[in-house]
């Protein structure tokens, strides 16, 4: 299934049905009074979050959605049926914006939330409403209300507790596959991950969700590489796990490249709690590991955790630390 996280769609509520002009007809009664019924209300447009969905692909190829119109009123004071509301399911994490993106209408953060974005049009009045002492046989009725229509922008931000960040080929996808049952595409070349991957980490009787996004490169916040499109998917997380390729010749430069892109993208990411991991330590000597840890500690003033996603060394410690951080944030 394609991962789609941005779409533009057209929505319209159902129009109200027209009121009816009718007069009572009955044997032996020459001039029955007005008995035109009211039109039915048009259907509304409602969005609903659904935890079974994780992409907006359903709105990629079909872009126009209209609720059902209300029926016209009938004789014998019978009202027209109301139109069916249109319910559109979206993944948790979906945000509904105006077409230009300047107005946020709603943000779905839990399952089964509903938001009525357009109300159906009111039904028109039948001629029975207009009978008076001076007009016993009115032919007046009103038309149903025309419902609102609009183009809107849907944007999906995945919900996760932990976000994995790092340069391409830092080992994020391997880390995700080791700690979860997720099966991301993994290979030894940059940009293996082309879409965000989610996995659930189980620690004893507790769990949390972790997200791996495509690797960041310099200029990602401006659209370079793939990362800028997907950085939004880690804005909601509680903690970042920053993986650094231990086999790199300049681990400090690698760290600073990613860190700068996070800070330039948004204050949300800039202020996230960060756990820094020196990965691929299985290909380094103890002396090389310590040397690179010392350089990173000096540059970041933070604790550096040596790990290997190939041998699993140090990985469990990071998982437990992430869980503890998440619990402290809630």
From Swiss-Prot:
Q: Which PROSITE patterns match?
A: G_OBG, GTP1_OBG, OBG
Enzyme Commission (EC) number: 3.6.5.-
Keyword list, A-Z: Cytoplasm, GTP-binding, Hydrolase, Magnesium, Metal-binding, Nucleotide-binding
The residues covered by the OBG-type G domain are 160-327
Pfam families, A to Z: GTP1_OBG, MMR_HSR1
Gene that specifies this protein: obg
User: What does the record give as the function of this protein?
Assistant: An essential GTPase which binds GTP, GDP and possibly (p)ppGpp with moderate affinity, with high nucleotide exchange rates and a fairly low GTP hydrolysis rate. Plays a role in control of the cell cycle, stress response, ribosome biogenesis and in those bacteria that undergo differentiation, in morphogenesis control.
User: For Mg(2+), which residues are the binding ones?
Assistant: 173, 193
Q: What CDD domains is this protein classified in?
A: Obg
Give the protein's cofactors.
Mg(2+)
Localized where? Cytoplasm
Occurrences of domain Obg (ranges): 1-159
How is the subunit organization of this protein annotated in UniProt?
Monomer.
Q: Which PANTHER family match?
A: DEVELOPMENTALLY REGULATED GTP-BINDING PROTEIN-RELATED (PTHR11702), MITOCHONDRIAL RIBOSOME-ASSOCIATED GTPASE 2 (PTHR11702:SF31)
Q: What GO molecular function terms would the record report?
A: GTP binding; GTPase activity; magnesium ion binding
Keyword Protein transport annotated: no
Q: What is its main location?
A: cytoplasm
Q: Which InterPro entries match?
A: G_OBG, GTP-bd, GTP-bd_Obg/CgtA, GTP1-OBG_CS, GTP1_OBG_dom, GTP1_OBG_dom_sf, OBG_GTPase, P-loop_NTPase
The residue ranges crossing the membrane are none
Q: Has the keyword Methyltransferase been applied to this entry?
A: no
Its EC top class is hydrolase
Q: Which family does it belong to?
A: Belongs to the TRAFAC class OBG-HflX-like GTPase superfamily. OBG GTPase family.
Q: What is this protein called?
A: GTPase Obg
Spell out the Gene3D superfamilies in the cross-references. GTP1/OBG domain, P-loop containing nucleotide triphosphate hydrolases
